[in-house]
């Protein structure tokens, strides 16, 4: 903090510890010396200068006598051992330095090593002496602090230190009387100067010393109430005369000052308002009533409790504000329908008459509901009981009874019944649940594959149409949820599941076939319903054989309950009737870029359908697919060539980058395209080289886990799987130009065969 320019520099007060000599000086002389030294150490330069100008002049003849020099030497010698002066002998100012008048003496300060005492005559020019001292300090490099005192004060100090010597000369009484008489005048002047200085300090704006003398003891008992909050509560004299007498506190009420009463502000307001006959009260009267009946709010509580009272008055609808005709005075009342007429006397009453000895400690007891309830059980005759209000905390809490079985807001997924061994292969809800492996020679019924990430589908061996539509697929992608059509607008068709690879690029009905070694074992499916190849959608499985492996694309035509495709623990497919072909996975799979040469047998839907014409060129609508050039037909991403119309991330079909996805997909139109069955018997089985087999032989475990994460229902026709982000961006531009709404002649016949199965 910057000091005021008018405020003089005040040195810090230091108490001088001066050892006493053997001889005791006179009391007047000692007091005179102490006053002089305190004045020397404390008063600033300019204050001393003004004081010295008012002092009586000293004759120059007395100052220029050689005895004066000797007296100065004697003063320095006497102060040196007594006041522990530093090695700064008293110096007489040289005459050749301009600005110093005659008679000026300089000596070292008794306690401050970097300061010197300057004794000047009373009539000398203080300003010229200060300038001369400043020039001398710059030239000689000595102490830069000078304390200017008058010669009269020095004589008093000299007399104080020479007191023992005067006593030895038997002149103690006369010298002390003269010294005491001479001290009266400078002492009075110093007191006046000090008083003037204190007045200047008190007048300063930066002075905060008065804060140390502040205390709250002088404040009155009602000083807290002296707040300007009567803006709307100024009661005129006539209204005060008509005001009913208010109820006074019960003398038996225990006045507790230390703790807060166990009542809410809402209850306190009701106590106050209901205490008057007219059941109305001004805001100021409410404050006064609460303070009179509960001293805690008067002496202990912070003033913010009044804000809480105003807040509760405005918050609750039961408190109504009424105004007089002149709108000068407003009262607070309680709504008649909400008024319970709750008063303090009703809440607190004596349980039994008590002796005065028992009554005295009860006055100090805090009226707490919890303490009263606990004490009422054990000592109901000795303690007062609180008539319970509604509980303070729970009075505004409405109990809500929740049912034991909470309502199901979303359709829950029915869990699949797995065997005891299938718990090892269970993954998360987004993973395919794969049954553990078992030997192919087991006579047990084969375990089947189930899904939790798609629609609930029963075991493939026991597929029923009424079980296909029980549950929706829970998708993890928001894009899937946005693309899903409403339930009432989509025909739900479910495709069978498989544990085949989910590499992100291939999901065709493809199998490994040994065409050269065992041409009779070429995996074919018959167009009739008696012998379908009910192999599930992802069919890149390894066929056990002795010769080289080839990749063949074979699609399933009809999925019936008579000839199910059974899937065992060791990932083996059994065709239970005409073609008992065993498919195993004995080797590991690899993840490599797929190599495709030609279309093989296109895929078909798992729903019952009829074979269509074979003269059409589109692989989606024809029974046979035309072979194409492997170079021109290559694409980095393939889509299925059957009824799985969605560009799966792991499909190996062709795709078109020309249009938007699903533009030509008449999902809400004729379902004939969905029910066109392709007969794979007439399509040639084309071979691929064995590198494709090595790609399928080593497959990572992640692909097996995500193997059937794609939907096997028609919902996936409108859903893009976004597990592979880079692939999903490519699939956004895929269009199915081969799907058109032609050939709608068989729709009625197909649906007439399909829909009765749900009954």
Swiss-Prot record:
Q: In which tissues is it expressed?
A: Localized to the animal hemisphere of early cleavage stage embryos. During neurulation, expressed in the neural folds. Later, expressed in the spinal cord and in the eye field. During tailbud stages, expression is still restricted to the neuroectoderm, predominantly to the hindbrain, the eye and the spinal cord. With ongoing development, expression is also found at lower levels in the branchial arches. At stage 35, expressed in the rhombencephalon and in the eye retina.
Transmembrane ranges, per UniProt, are none
Q: Where is the composition biased (Low complexity)?
A: 601-612
Q: Does the keyword DNA damage apply?
A: yes
| Highest taxon of source | Eukaryota
Which intervals of the chain are annotated as region Disordered? Answer: 1-92, 420-450, 516-535, 596-631
Which processes are annotated in GO (biological process)?
DNA repair; G2/M transition of mitotic cell cycle; regulation of cell population proliferation; regulation of transcription by RNA polymerase II
Bias class Basic and acidic residues marks the residues at 48-63
Q: Name one GO molecular function term.
A: DNA-binding transcription factor activity
The residue ranges marked as DNA-binding region are 260-358
| Functional description taken from the UniProt entry | Transcription factor regulating the expression of cell cycle genes essential for DNA replication and mitosis. Plays a role in the control of cell proliferation. Also plays a role in DNA break repair, participating in the DNA damage checkpoint response. Promotes transcription of PHB2.
Q: What is this protein called?
A: Forkhead box protein M1
What species is this protein from?
Xenopus laevis (African clawed frog)
Q: Name the gene for this chain.
A: foxm1
